[in-house]
């Protein structure tokens, strides 16, 4: 079963105007969302891209690392926990004139080892999956995160200028239908 949601704002940087087949990311990154007892573990980012925003832990892929290995490593570095029962949950493609172009891999974990702890990179915060603070997050999150936390997988294309979402195209999949691009 596939559902599609689409919205557009502005006249520049429409998702449909980009040749995504030839598009190349400048960075490959990951996000991890740990879910336990109908709550999701998010972070308030303390530094780097998105500092001050709430998001899932994650970061840039290192040489020789798979996206899943990166997501687990970054979660451990940012929260001092090891995510368990990890599943791929989507891919996000971000195009911006004033920020790096990013191909993001999304993962969900339904268990973890350790105690979520503040680090120099992040402050851990638990939220009910029904009360996610979208107003404090990247603008694109409101178009896909809730569905991913409810078990769908996502492929999303987003265009930004000055950290403002201009356009997006999002498709949701049941897990058995989702095949990552890379």
Where are these regions (language model features)?
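Conserved N-terminal beta-strand and adjoining loop/helix that marks the start
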Residues: 15-41, 60
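Short, charged/polar surface micro-motifs in flexible loops or helix N-caps
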Residues: 35-39, 110-115, 151-152
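Unchanged
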Residues: 61-84, 93-148, 169-182
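Short Pro/Gly-enriched beta-strand edge/turn motifs at strand-loop
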Residues: 10-18, 89
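A positional/architectural concept
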Residues: 51-53
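Intrinsically disordered, low-complexity segments enriched in serine/proline and basic residues
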Residues: 4-5
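A structural microfeature
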Residues: 42, 90-93
């Amino acid at each position: 079963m596939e559902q599609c949601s689409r919205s557009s704002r502005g006249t520049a940087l429409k998702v449909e105007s980009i040749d995504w087949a030839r598009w190349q990311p400048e960075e490959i990154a990951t996000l991890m969302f740990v879910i336990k007892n109908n709550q999701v573990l998010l972070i308030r980012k303390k530094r780097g891209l998105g500092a001050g925003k709430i998001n899932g832990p994650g970061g840039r892929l290192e040489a020789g690392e798979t996206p899943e290995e990166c997501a687990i490593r970054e979660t451990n570095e940012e929260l001092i926990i090891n995510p368990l029962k990890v599943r791929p949950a989507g891919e996000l493609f971000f195009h911006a004139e004033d920020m790096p172009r990013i191909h993001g891999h999304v993962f969900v974990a339904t268990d973890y080892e350790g105690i979520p702890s503040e680090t120099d990179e992040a402050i851990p915060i638990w939220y009910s999956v029904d009360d996610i603070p979208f107003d404090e997050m990247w603008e694109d999150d409101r178009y896909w995160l809730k569905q991913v936390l409810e078990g769908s997988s996502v492929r999303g294309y987003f265009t930004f200028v000055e950290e403002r979402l201009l356009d997006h195209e999002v498709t949701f999949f049941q897990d058995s239908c989702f095949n990552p691009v890379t």
